[in-house]
């Protein structure tokens, strides 16, 4: 007997008992985003590798170590399974000239892929919802995105999260700070861990995000990015804080907050929880005013965020949330050949009336079928025997209430069930 084939490590099946919670989340997301005027954009899972090299940054962990990249043997193109969604969204906006009609509020959802070490809350295939506001320059749109998130947490019953915000300033002010940070860290060159030494000359701001306790001790005395902020970036950040306070959104300023993608500038933010261990960030984003031009479009400001669906569902599970199973309204049982044929008509007629119906399949006597009807969770069993076939009727037996079995015409069954 051959060995069974299993799912790829770090890429998980979503089983029927779990999919109810996914469906609830997805329905909530669509309603929530429509309330703010955001429209859905769907992009391919596979993109040109250069899209991510240009946008995310050539010396980031994602591009250097985590992307699933391959060469198309038909034409030699270098292709990559998307590791994140913002670059694909921006590419589509440029390619289809969407900004010609004015600023755009867009969102996407779907699977992303990174070749990481699988652990709780971190998978090689994971799912994100991303929200992007393109063509908006002011701090008001930054605030809108954060306020949107706060509303979503309420809709999902999530309360154990906190908001951390910061600013990365402009490209120019960040360059000044980068030089000061390198100069400071070089004094501790022998004490830096391997990751920090690698990043020192390529992406030193990412060192600020180190979780290594020894590195945190070194970083405690590091210069602050705030000290090198340009006036416009500082004014932008102060305006954002005013709006958040006016909207009663609590936040913490985290001077060490940086993002793992190179394209961010000015506002950055994360929603964090302590209930998921090391993978505590459930939503993160910020402003990326240079990305559209970087990918080849006409310069335009932009801001957005992405949230990890698996982490949010895990947090909902910690709070006791469960998804609704696809429980039928009615389970159709039948005895005899004529009844089996008539049961098809009954099931389809009830479905036409908007009911969720399971038609018994696989044979079995009446008692066995009724056990399956009860196990299905349905409120009612529709019983069809020879007498029902002759009369063109069905017998309705309540399964969850102490009520009498009744026989009704098929045409009036749905209305009757709605009144019981």
Swiss-Prot record:
In alphabetical order, the GO MF annotations are: ATP binding; histidine-tRNA ligase activity
Any single Gene Ontology cellular-component annotation: cytoplasm
Primary location: cytoplasm
Keyword rRNA-binding assigned: no
EC class of this enzyme? ligase
Could you list this entry's UniProt keywords, alphabetically sorted. Aminoacyl-tRNA synthetase, ATP-binding, Cytoplasm, Ligase, Nucleotide-binding, Protein biosynthesis
Q: Which SUPFAM superfamilies match?
A: Class II aaRS ABD-related, Class II aaRS and biotin synthetases
Q: Which GO terms describe its biological process?
A: histidyl-tRNA aminoacylation
Reactions catalysed according to its record: tRNA(His) + L-histidine + ATP = L-histidyl-tRNA(His) + AMP + diphosphate + H(+)
Q: Which CDD domains match?
A: HisRS-like_core, HisRS_anticodon
Q: Where in the cell is it found?
A: Cytoplasm
Q: Which PANTHER family match?
A: HISTIDINE--TRNA LIGASE, MITOCHONDRIAL-RELATED, HISTIDYL-TRNA SYNTHETASE
Q: What name has this protein been given in UniProt?
A: Histidine--tRNA ligase
Species assigned in the record: Nitrosomonas europaea (strain ATCC 19718 / CIP 103999 / KCTC 2705 / NBRC 14298)
Q: Which classification does the entry list for the species?
A: Bacteria, Pseudomonadati, Pseudomonadota, Betaproteobacteria, Nitrosomonadales
